Each structure stands twice: as C-alpha cells, then as structure tokens.
A protein has these predicted regions:
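Secondary-structure edge/capping motif, primarily at the C-terminal ends of alpha-helices
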Residues: 26-33, 60-63, 89, 116-119, ...
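Carboxylate-rich helix-loop segments that flank metal/cofactor sites and access channels
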Residues: 58-96, 100-103, 107-109
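Alpha-helical bundle segments that constitute or directly flank the non-heme di-iron/ferroxidase center
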Residues: 2-34, 96-120
Length: 151
C-alpha cells in the first residue's frame, strides 16, 4: 500500500505542476496580449489553475504525502518555456500567444486523462480530477471559439 500511495502522490504532484505551469503561462499570456477580452479570460484561467493546484495539494495531504514545491512538470515546463520564447519573438502577437495556449491546454488534457484512466488512482480522487479536466476542456473550447470569431 505504501508504494501505491507514493505512486498516487507522484501522479497528483504531476497534475499540481501542470496546474501551476498553466497559471504562469496564462499570466504571461495576459501580460503580452493586447485584446482586453482575451486578457480577462486568460486571467480567469490563471485563477482557475491556482484553485486546481490548491485542491490537488489537499488530496496529497489526505494521502499523507508531501506536495512538491513549484518545479513544473515536464509537459508544463515545456509549455512555460515555449510561452516565454514565443512572446519574446512575436512581440505579443495574439495569434502566436493563443496558439501556444491551445498547445498547452491540449497537453494538460492529455496528462489529466492519463491520470483519470490510471487504475492505481483511487476512485475518491477521480471526481475532482475529472472536474478540473472539464474546466481545462472548457477553457480550450473558449480559446478556440475566440480564434473562430476572428476568422
């Protein structure tokens, strides 16, 4: 049971890192983008990710595990670095920023689904993870709808 608990804590910590990286990515995107409507959405998405990380930390505590300090997940850090590079070279180009956010959300969705589908993750954890996944999917749909509105 101990090894399973460590495994679960590791997986939840991975989601915490993804949520924190998403928060940071959206804050960076909000700073760079000029469209006030999109900026407001990005700030709301950043706030959502802060809440997600906090909720996931509670799960880690309930499992008597230790939440990792901010370090970034492998998928999330790649997104964060890419966001930094993109904004530097694009000078705040809205399309490039939005496309980077789409890429980050698609990567987050993939990782959340892997954790949800993992039989080692306790059923008691899955409703919250599923709810967060739904929020990420809604954010992605919102971003994509903005792209389609511009066309």
């Amino acid at each position: 049971m101990e090894n399973n608990n460590e495994y679960v804590v590791d997986k939840i910590n991975h989601l915490i890192n993804i949520a924190e990286d998403g928060k940071e990515g959206y804050e960076n995107a909000a700073e760079e983008i000029k469209d006030s409507g999109v900026k407001g959405s990005f700030l709301l998405f950043a706030q959502d990710r802060l809440v997600y990380a906090s909720q996931l930390r509670e799960i880690v505590g309930q499992l008597h595990g230790e939440a990792e300090d901010k370090g970034g997940g492998s998928v999330g850090s790649l997104h964060r670095v890419w966001m930094d590079i993109k904004s530097t070279f694009t000078g705040g180009d809205a399309d490039a920023i939005i496309n980077t956010c789409i890429t980050g959300e698609e990567a987050a969705i993939k990782e959340y689904k892997l954790v949800l589908d993992d039989d080692e993750i306790p059923e008691s954890c899955k409703p919250l993870i599923g709810k967060q996944l739904n929020g990420i999917e809604q954010a992605l749909a919102s971003i994509k709808s903005h792209v389609h509105e511009k066309v």
